[in-house]
Amino acid sequence: MTVNLEEYFRTTFEDKLLVKMPEREDDHLTPATRLLEKRREMSEVEQALGAQKEEFQMKMESLQQRREELERKEYQLRESLLKFDKFLKENDSKRARALKKAQEERDMRRAKDCEIARLKEDTSGLMKGRDKVQHRLEKYIIYQQYLEKVLENAEEFQEIREIIARYDTLTATHQDLLERELKNQEKYEKEKARLIKFTEEKNNEILNYNNQLANLQTKLEKTQSVAVKWESQWTHIKNTAAKKTLLLGRIKMATHNLFMLVNRHLGQTGMVDMTDKQLDKIQVFIQDLTQITLDIKRAENAITASGANTAG
């Protein structure tokens, strides 16, 4: 336990540490007397403080002893609680085992009761079965008598069980023949259904092919009509192209002739194979010739006007 001594003295022994000072009657005392008085007061304060410290230390030791005693009692109490808890757990375990054993005995007794009831039901069922078998035996005794008479009159059988075995064989053969007939009938019905389905599918396919053939025939006729139309247009295009080709050849020939005339007029011998370049040169020549002609006409007009003015 941590103790703040300063806080303890301040809160607990504040009143005790206050020393009542005498009223101010020392105005007539000398400084030496006052110093002695102050030392005496300090000594009294230190004695009081020492006494308080001893008292505090004694209380702290008492508190420490009390705390140790409380811890010891707490440990003893905790040990007692652990022992008591262990005792309760052991009692609970014994009680649980006893309850479990009692429950197991009740379950076992209940199972035995159920088994007894089931055995009683089985016994009752067996008794009923025995009575039923006895009744059937009494009912079928006439068949045994009949088989005995058959055995007396039939030379091929020596015992009744031979007759029964022959009957079982004939019955099994008859049942086998019935099953074969049923399987054959089912197979026949399946094959018949498959044939009908196959015939319907083929008829549908033929009908579908006929429809497709009709559509293809219609498309063929349309295609042939379009082909005739396009063939006519192609012939027209070829004829038009031939005419335009002829015209283009004539234009190129005329352009070449004009180009040659321009070259001779200009005194040039250079050759140009491209028609568009030939046309460009011809255009420039015509523009120059036109400009020269205009200049000559303007000069003639000027001369005529000057002569008229002179005559006047």
From Swiss-Prot:
Keyword field: Coiled coil
N-terminal signal peptide: none
Pfam family, one: DUF4200
Residue ranges that the Swiss-Prot or TrEMBL entry lists as coiled coil: 34-121, 172-233
Classification via InterPro entries: CFAP_domain-containing, DUF4200
Record family assignment: Belongs to the CFAP73 family.
Protein name per UniProt: Coiled-coil domain-containing protein 42 homolog
Species whose genome carries this gene: Nematostella vectensis
